[in-house]
């Protein structure tokens, strides 16, 4: 079973994302900021990270840059899931090493499609 780390400062978003991912046969864990997510990745690397942009302590971009620097390459797959939907944010995310980008609000079909596109389903 593949594992996805859900990183968002909103408990509601984490809960909704986990339900969707559970329905897609993923095991899940969660973090409420990038710093906690990075610590979890150091302990046990997930197959995927569903990542918010704006979070306290360490935002999504800072997390992604640190993660890619530590592990190199394109693993785990990182999919941003955020309200930041302008071209500048999308470009920054992809340049930092994101594999995909989802805009909130999201539903099961969008998550499933993006996870298929990056080879997780």
What are the language-model segments listed below?
Residues 55:
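Receiver (REC) domain active-site loop signature in two-component systems and cognate sites
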Residues 104:
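A Lys-centered signature of the CheY-like receiver
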Residues 39, 61-74:
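Short amphipathic alpha-helix used as the core "switch/output" element in two-component signaling
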Residues 15-23:
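Charged docking surfaces used in two-component/phosphorelay signaling
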Residues 62, 85-100, 110-113:
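Alpha4 helix (beta4-alpha4-beta5 surface) of REC/receiver domains from two-component response regulators
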Residues 44-50:
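Active-site beta3 strand of CheY-like receiver
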Residues 30-39, 60:
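Helix N-cap/capping motif at the beta->alpha junctions
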């Amino acid at each position: 079973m593949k594992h996805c780390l859900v990183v968002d400062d909103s408990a509601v978003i984490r809960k909704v994302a986990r339900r969707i991912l559970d329905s897609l046969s993923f095991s899940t864990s969660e973090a409420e900021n990038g710093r906690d997510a990075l610590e979890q990745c150091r302990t046990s690397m997930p197959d995927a990270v569903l990542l918010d942009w704006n979070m306290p302590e360490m935002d999504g971009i800072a997390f992604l840059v640190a993660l890619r620097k530590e592990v190199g390459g394109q693993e785990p797959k990182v999919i941003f899931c955020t309200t930041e939907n302008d071209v500048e944010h999308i470009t920054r995310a992809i340049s930092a090493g994101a594999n995909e980008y989802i805009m909130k609000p999201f539903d099961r079909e969008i998550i499933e499609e993006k996870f298929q596109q990056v080879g997780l389903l």
